[in-house]
Amino acid sequence: MGDRGYLVLPDMLTSQQKIGVLTTKRKDEEIRHYLDINEIGFDLLKKQAGQQVTAILDWDLRYHQMRIHSAVHLIHCILEQVTGHSIPYPVRSPLNDESGENHYQLLDYIDKDILEKATTELNEFCSSGHEIQTVNVPEQGNNFRIWKCGRWSIPCGGTHVKDTKEIGMIFSTLKIKKNMTRIALRLSDNSG
């Protein structure tokens, strides 16, 4: 899930009209903005080609994504701690407006009781406040970064909060189907 927000074009500055950015995606080393425009808006954009624009980020969405992204890494790490197993990285970790998930190949040693225990430990860990870092590792290649919190580290190039207190209360659910273990996390509305 990419960022959302608005673009304000030079001719629009006085009238405060905005063009919605529905999402952003990286493709071929470019950041592409997918816009909410009609034919009139498209004609206006063509006239403004090459002009500088002002981008307004939907910060509430971005901050939620940073919180949930950090939480899905932490639940993985704490599940390893609770189960005593090294857990393969998720095959997917999709984020959306409401939640974040880790999708694993079937993990038969994780059940609702284990997830409940891990979620309790996760909430205790987060509320006690721990620094979260993202560290560039240039010897691994361009743009290679590692997420770090406490003794844990995971390869990740995404955005994260700086402290676990910012995440807030976490709620979890477990679904097992079609040889997949899916752990979904939701956050309370309040952080820190």
Question: Can you say where each PLM-predicted feature lies in the sequence?
Answer:
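Active-/binding-site microenvironments in catalytic and ligand-binding cores
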Residues: 1-192
